[in-house]
C-alpha cells in the first residue's frame, strides 16, 4: 500500500544516517528503517479511525437535539443521511479496523476537544450542507461526500497536524502519505455490508519489508564496488568529491536495477531523479541522470541488468 518512492526515500534516509555515523551500525539502522515503515501504518490506521469518531459525534448531535427542552419538528425527526451513509457505517463498524487499532495501540481517547472542533468544521462545511439538503442520494454521492470532507476538511485541519506532531516527530512527515492511503481506502471500498479491505495489510507490509530490507542490505554490501563504478564514469570527479546524497542515490539506483528484475530501468532512473530534486542540490538531477543513463546502458550490455515480466517494459 505504501508507494515505492516513499520506501526508497526511507531507505535513502537510513543509508544517509549510516554514512553520518548516526543511529549505530547497519543492523541498528535497518531496524529503525523498518520501524519507520511500521509507524506509517500506525498513522494510517489512526487517521482512518476519524470516520468512526465523526459518526459517533453526529449520532450524539441527533440525540442532543431530541433531548432539547423545547425541540422543534426538525429536532425530533432530524435527517440521518450522514450517520446512515453506508460507507461511513462500514468504516465505523469495521472489526478489522478495531482489531488493527487495538494491536497498534492507537486511538482518540482524551481528544474530545479536537474531535468536537473537527466535527463542527465538517457540519458547517458547504459540502456537508449540500449533501444533507439534496433531495436524494446515491452510492456515488455517499462515497464522494466522505472523500470531499476528508480531503478538504479533515486532512487540512490544523488541529490534526498539531496532534500528529505532538504524538510523534516521525508522524508529521508521513501525514501526507497516510492521508493519501486513507483517501484511497474510501475511494476503493464497496458500499455493501462487510469489512473495509484491510485484509491485505499484512501481505502489503511483508512485501514492503522485503523491498526495503533487500534494497538497504544490498546497497550497503555493494558500497565499494558501486562507488568505484560510479566514480569511473564521473569525469573529473573523484568518489570523495561527489556529494554524499548524490552518491547514495546512485548506489541505490544501481542496486535496484541489478536486484529487482521486475522494476523497469526507466522507472528506477526516474524515481531517483525525483528523490534527488527533494534531497540533493539543484544540479544533482542532471548529474545523476547523466551518470546512471550511461551506467545502465553498460550494465544492460554486459548482462549485469536482467529484467523479466513487467521489468522489460520501457527498459
Where does each model-flagged region fall?
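Class I Rossmann-like S-adenosyl-L-methionine
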Residues: 1-315
Amino acid at each position: 500500500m505504501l508507494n515505492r518512492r516513499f520506501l526508497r526515500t526511507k531507505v535513502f534516509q537510513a543509508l544517509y544516517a549510516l554514512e553520518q555515523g548516526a543511529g549505530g551500525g547497519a543492523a541498528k539502522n535497518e531496524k529503525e528503517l523498518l520501524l519507520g515503515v511500521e509507524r506509517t501504518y500506525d498513522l494510517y490506521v489512526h487517521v482512518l479511525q476519524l470516520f468512526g469518531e465523526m459518526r459517533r459525534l453526529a449520532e450524539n448531535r441527533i440525540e442532543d437535539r431530541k433531548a432539547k427542552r423545547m425541540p422543534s419538528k426538525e429536532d425530533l425527526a432530524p435527517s440521518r443521511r450522514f450517520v446512515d451513509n453506508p460507507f461511513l457505517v462500514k468504516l465505523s463498524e469495521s472489526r478489522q479496523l478495531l482489531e488493527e487499532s487495538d494491536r497498534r495501540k492507537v486511538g482518540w481517547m482524551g481528544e474530545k476537544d479536537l474531535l468536537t472542533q473537527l466535527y463542527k468544521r465538517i457540519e458547517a462545511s458547504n459540502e456537508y450542507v449540500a449533501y444533507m439538503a439534496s433531495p436524494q442520494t446515491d452510492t456515488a454521492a455517499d462515497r464522494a461526500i466522505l472523500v470531499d470532507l476528508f480531503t478538504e476538511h479533515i486532512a487540512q485541519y490544523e488541529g490534526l497536524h498539531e496532534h500528529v506532531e505532538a504524538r510523534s516527530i516521525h508522524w508529521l512527515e508521513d501525514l501526507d502519505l497516510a492521508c493519501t492511503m486513507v483517501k484511497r481506502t474510501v475511494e476503493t471500498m464497496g458500499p455493501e455490508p462487510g469489512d473495509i479491505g484491510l485484509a491485505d495489510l499484512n501481505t502489503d507490509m511483508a512485501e514492503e519489508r522485503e523491498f526495503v530490507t533487500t534494497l538497504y542490505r544490498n546497497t550497503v554490501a555493494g558500497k565499494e564496488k558501486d562507488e568505484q563504478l560510479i566514480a569511473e564514469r564521473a569525469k573529473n570527479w573523484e568518489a570523495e568529491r561527489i556529494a554524499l546524497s548524490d552518491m547514495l542515490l546512485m548506489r541505490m539506483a544501481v542496486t535496484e536495477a541489478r536486484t529487482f528484475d521486475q522494476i523497469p530501468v526507466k522507472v528506477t532512473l526516474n524515481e531517483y531523479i525525483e528523490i534527488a530534486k527533494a534531497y540533493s542540490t539543484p544540479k544533482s538531477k542532471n548529474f545523476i541522470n547523466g551518470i546512471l543513463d550511461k551506467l545502465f546502458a553498460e550494465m544492460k550490455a554486459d548482462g549485469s541488468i536482467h529484467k523479466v515480466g513487467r521489468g522489460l517494459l520501457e527498459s
